[in-house]
A protein has these predicted regions:
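Allosteric regulatory "coupling" segments in signal-transduction proteins
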Residues: 74-102
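Signal-transmission linkers at sensory-effector interfaces
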Residues: 1-38
Length: 175
């Protein structure tokens, strides 16, 4: 009987944990929905990089977020997001098959942030047009918390955020 009670207790704890994860995922999905609506309601393409980054910061509590793009249409080449990436940045972003999450080990992308020294952990999310293999940009999320973006974390929601950001920002690419 004691063994059965222990098994039941273990199952109750697992069930409670599953419910908690479900609630967390629902909350993330709600924030994702609000941020997506913010992107869709942005009429001016030139405003999209700032709306995307500031919206992620606000809706998801990310202390720092920025976007860097390359190969944009001439009308958008003067935007801050289209300036300052090295010649290596496109190849680095394209090499990422999924978001990089981990420590800021002096990566170039951290220098694009307002306060690079405060970026202990990073999520670097490649931006691709549709199913194309080449990245046309990088979404950079940063936190002073070294565990916020850890190498062992799941990246499903970050991948969705990257897909949505890329879809919105593809308006800045040449026709």
């Amino acid at each position: 009987a004691e063994l059965l009670r222990e098994k039941i207790k273990g199952l109750e704890l697992k069930g409670a944990e599953m419910i908690r994860h479900g609630h967390e995922n629902t909350a993330i999905a709600d924030r994702l929905q609000r941020w997506t609506l913010q992107l869709l309601n942005t009429r001016e393409a030139a405003e999209l990089p700032e709306v995307a980054a500031s919206g992620i910061a606000a809706h998801f509590g990310v202390p720092q977020a920025t976007v860097k793009l390359w190969g944009v249409a001439p009308d958008f080449a003067a935007l801050p997001c289209a300036q300052g990436a090295s010649a290596d940045a496109p190849a680095f972003a394209t090499s990422l098959s999924k978001p990089y999450c981990g420590a800021n080990r002096g990566l170039e992308a951290a220098t694009w942030l307002a306060d690079p020294a405060a970026a202990a952990s990073l999520a670097l999310i490649p931006l691709r047009a549709g199913d194309g293999p080449q990245a046309f940009g990088l979404l950079v999320l940063a936190s002073p918390d070294p565990q916020r973006f850890a190498a062992d974390m799941g990246t499903d929601f970050l991948e969705r955020i990257g897909e949505l950001t890329a879809a919105a920002l593809s308006r800045l690419l040449p026709a």
